[in-house]
Amino acid sequence: GLYGACALGWTAVQGAVAAPPHLKAVFAYMTATNYYRGWTYSDGVFELGFQLSWVWTILARDTISRLGLEPAARAEAERTLVEAARDVRGSARHLPLIDFPAYQNGAAPYWREWLSHPGYDDFWRRVDAVARADRIKVPVLHMTAWYDTCLRGHVDLYSALQLRGDKQVRDQHRFVLGPWDHSAYYNKRPSCAGQRDFGPAVMTGPDTLAPLAFQWFDYWLMGKGDAFMPESKVRYFHMGDNVWKEADSWPPPHSVVPYYLHSAGQANSRAGDGVLTTEPPHTEPTDSYVYDPFDPVPTTGGRSMIDVLPGVENQTQVEERQDVLVYTTPRLAEPVAITGPVSVTLYASSSAADTDFTAKLVDV
């Protein structure tokens, strides 16, 4: 059996794709499956904050130790990394990114490769487990979280196995989606994601994950017990009412409800006139804002793994900015359940040579 989280989870997933004859089952959690989509890039945008901090805190330090540098040169390379890590936001301002100073001493040779392949091409395809999911022939249990950096990769792997896996793989495939962040397997606050405590029903960490792993592998490797094999293939935590639910597919059976952006042309900040409703707009003015790349909107909570806390965080300071357009529904008359992927169709133009548009769904 193969088991692991994060980097070790990569090994488990890639091992499943390699399909060695002795492999009988896999349990992978909080890990990437497609190293382009949702890991190095998100919808074509380089994951700058995450990649900077991940590379210098984990990868580059190990690489430097293997370069055979003289003591003085090694100390200088490590000092450069430490200085960069002390100021993630300041380091992120360096242009061009491909010439990031801390990585010019051999500490991260892959950095230039990543930035040289901004689109999904053969460079990424050759290590994409999702694209090769049809090669997986063993039972797979994989687990991620709403606030995990790797959420998208797990959802993509689930879809790929259900679409392209053979019947036995589909029947034996199980997916768990909890309310944690990426550090759930060693978190000192195992029921929390950011500022929200979801209660004892979501406790995770070694004391919870180890029994689950033993149960899974006892069944598939030793023929003991009933494994983690409920009839439903998906177990997910429904935030808001804070309960675990089960479904036969992901996303669960649902209806798509489109919401539309409205304003009188002044949707800037939470004090603006932006409104979100299910009524299509007619003739309305455009909303605009001034984008300053040297004063970007800060990452606040969410699926992050950088120098800010992931999970549920207060968005007030973000929504008070004039370069953020805010559209809010009227007070809800009854609870609304939102489960599954959320997408935005945006019509926009910009005078900037290069810019990105992002959208965030926030519980008010």
Where are these regions (language model features)?
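Short beta-strand immediately N-terminal to the catalytic nucleophile in serine-hydrolase-like folds
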Residues: 2-4, 29
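Glycine-rich nucleophile elbow surrounding the catalytic serine of serine-hydrolase chemistry
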Residues: 4-14
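Catalytic cores of eukaryotic secretory-pathway lumenal/extracellular enzymes that build
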Residues: 12, 22-28, 33, 126, ...
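Accessory cap/linker subdomain of secreted extracellular hydrolases
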Residues: 17-19, 24-135
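C-terminal, loop-rich substrate-recognition/catalytic regions characterized by aromatic stacking residues
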Residues: 74-102, 185, 190-364
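Short beta-strand/loop motif that positions the catalytic acidic residue
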Residues: 136, 142-144
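Acidic catalytic loop of the alpha/beta-hydrolase fold
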Residues: 146-151
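Active-site-adjacent alpha-helix of alpha/beta-hydrolase-fold enzymes
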Residues: 152-173
